[in-house]
Amino acid sequence: MKSVVFASLIASALAVPTELAPRTDVSSLCPAGLYSVPQCCATDILGVARLDCKAPKQTPRNADEFKNICAKGGQQAACCVVPVAGQSLFCMTPVGI
Protein backbone atom coordinates (compact mmCIF):
# COMPACT_ATOMS: atom_id res chain seq x y z
CA MET A 1 0.00 0.00 0.00
CA LYS A 2 2.81 2.40 0.88
CA SER A 3 4.55 1.70 -2.40
CA VAL A 4 1.41 2.63 -4.36
CA VAL A 5 1.16 5.98 -2.56
CA PHE A 6 4.89 6.60 -3.04
CA ALA A 7 4.70 5.72 -6.74
CA SER A 8 1.72 8.02 -7.31
CA LEU A 9 3.52 10.91 -5.57
CA ILE A 10 6.57 10.40 -7.77
CA ALA A 11 4.39 10.19 -10.89
CA SER A 12 2.54 13.41 -10.06
CA ALA A 13 5.83 15.21 -9.32
CA LEU A 14 7.19 14.15 -12.70
CA ALA A 15 4.01 15.28 -14.44
CA VAL A 16 4.40 18.90 -13.27
CA PRO A 17 6.13 21.04 -15.94
CA THR A 18 9.47 22.40 -14.81
CA GLU A 19 9.21 25.59 -16.81
CA LEU A 20 6.17 27.67 -17.62
CA ALA A 21 5.79 28.92 -21.18
CA PRO A 22 5.53 32.72 -21.55
CA ARG A 23 1.97 33.78 -22.17
CA THR A 24 0.36 36.75 -23.76
CA ASP A 25 -2.38 37.87 -21.46
CA VAL A 26 -4.25 40.82 -22.91
CA SER A 27 -6.78 40.56 -20.11
CA SER A 28 -4.20 41.98 -17.70
CA LEU A 29 -4.02 45.21 -19.72
CA CYS A 30 -7.69 46.10 -19.50
CA PRO A 31 -10.07 45.20 -16.69
CA ALA A 32 -12.68 42.52 -17.30
CA GLY A 33 -16.18 43.77 -17.95
CA LEU A 34 -17.18 47.05 -19.53
CA TYR A 35 -13.75 48.52 -20.43
CA SER A 36 -12.25 45.28 -21.74
CA VAL A 37 -11.31 46.20 -25.34
CA PRO A 38 -7.69 47.37 -25.87
CA GLN A 39 -7.57 50.13 -28.49
CA CYS A 40 -5.07 52.62 -29.93
CA CYS A 41 -6.86 55.98 -30.20
CA ALA A 42 -5.77 59.21 -31.89
CA THR A 43 -7.91 61.76 -30.05
CA ASP A 44 -8.79 61.97 -26.37
CA ILE A 45 -11.76 64.13 -25.38
CA LEU A 46 -11.60 65.07 -21.69
CA GLY A 47 -10.31 61.63 -20.76
CA VAL A 48 -13.69 60.01 -21.44
CA ALA A 49 -14.34 59.73 -25.18
CA ARG A 50 -11.78 58.64 -27.76
CA LEU A 51 -11.90 59.09 -31.53
CA ASP A 52 -10.29 57.21 -34.42
CA CYS A 53 -9.68 54.03 -32.42
CA LYS A 54 -8.25 50.83 -33.83
CA ALA A 55 -7.10 47.53 -32.38
CA PRO A 56 -3.33 47.38 -31.77
CA LYS A 57 -1.40 46.05 -34.78
CA GLN A 58 0.47 43.60 -32.54
CA THR A 59 -0.66 41.72 -29.46
CA PRO A 60 0.90 43.48 -26.46
CA ARG A 61 2.29 41.38 -23.60
CA ASN A 62 2.31 44.14 -20.98
CA ALA A 63 1.27 47.75 -20.39
CA ASP A 64 4.55 49.30 -21.57
CA GLU A 65 4.48 47.32 -24.80
CA PHE A 66 0.82 48.31 -25.34
CA LYS A 67 1.76 51.99 -24.88
CA ASN A 68 4.75 51.67 -27.27
CA ILE A 69 2.76 49.84 -29.97
CA CYS A 70 0.18 52.64 -29.99
CA ALA A 71 2.83 55.38 -29.80
CA LYS A 72 4.49 54.07 -33.00
CA GLY A 73 1.35 55.12 -34.86
CA GLY A 74 1.03 58.44 -33.00
CA GLN A 75 -1.84 57.14 -30.90
CA GLN A 76 -2.56 56.53 -27.23
CA ALA A 77 -3.33 53.23 -25.52
CA ALA A 78 -6.84 52.95 -24.08
CA CYS A 79 -9.25 50.39 -22.67
CA CYS A 80 -12.66 51.01 -24.19
CA VAL A 81 -16.21 49.81 -24.33
CA VAL A 82 -16.86 48.05 -27.65
CA PRO A 83 -16.25 50.80 -30.26
CA VAL A 84 -18.86 51.69 -32.87
CA ALA A 85 -17.58 52.96 -36.25
CA GLY A 86 -14.17 53.85 -34.81
CA GLN A 87 -15.67 55.97 -32.06
CA SER A 88 -15.12 54.73 -28.53
CA LEU A 89 -17.39 56.82 -26.39
CA PHE A 90 -16.23 55.42 -23.06
CA CYS A 91 -12.56 54.70 -22.43
CA MET A 92 -10.07 54.62 -19.60
CA THR A 93 -6.30 54.49 -19.23
CA PRO A 94 -5.00 50.91 -19.19
CA VAL A 95 -3.77 49.34 -15.97
CA GLY A 96 -0.07 50.04 -15.45
CA ILE A 97 0.24 53.13 -17.67
UniProtKB/Swiss-Prot annotation:
**What subcellular compartments does it reside in?**
Secreted; Secreted, Cell wall; Vacuole; Cytoplasmic vesicle
Pfam families from the xrefs? Hydrophobin_2
Keyword set, alphabetical order: Cell wall, Cytoplasmic vesicle, Disulfide bond, Secreted, Signal, Vacuole
Where does the UniProt annotation place the signal sequence?
1-15
| Induction section of the entry | Under normal conditions on SDAY medium (Sabouraud dextrose agar plus 1% yeast extract), hyd2A is up-regulated at transcriptional level during the first five days of incubation. Hyd1A is the most active at transcription level under normal culture conditions, followed by hyd1B, hyd1E, hyd2A and hyd2C in order.
Nucleus among keywords: no
What cystine linkages occur within this chain?
30-79, 40-53, 80-91
GO cellular component terms listed in the entry, alphabetical order: extracellular region
Q: Which domain of life is it from?
A: Eukaryota
Quote the disruption phenotype from the UniProt entry: Compromises aerial conidiation and submerged blastospore production. Does not affect radial growth and multiple stress responses.
Sum up the protein's function in the record's words.
Answer: Aerial growth, conidiation, and dispersal of filamentous fungi in the environment rely upon a capability of their secreting small amphipathic proteins called hydrophobins (HPBs) with low sequence identity. Class I can self-assemble into an outermost layer of rodlet bundles on aerial cell surfaces, conferring cellular hydrophobicity that supports fungal growth, development and dispersal; whereas Class II form highly ordered films at water-air interfaces through intermolecular interactions but contribute nothing to the rodlet structure.
Q: Which family does it belong to?
A: Belongs to the cerato-ulmin hydrophobin family.
Name under which the protein is recorded: Class II hydrophobin A
Q: Which organism is it from?
A: Beauveria bassiana (strain ARSEF 2860)
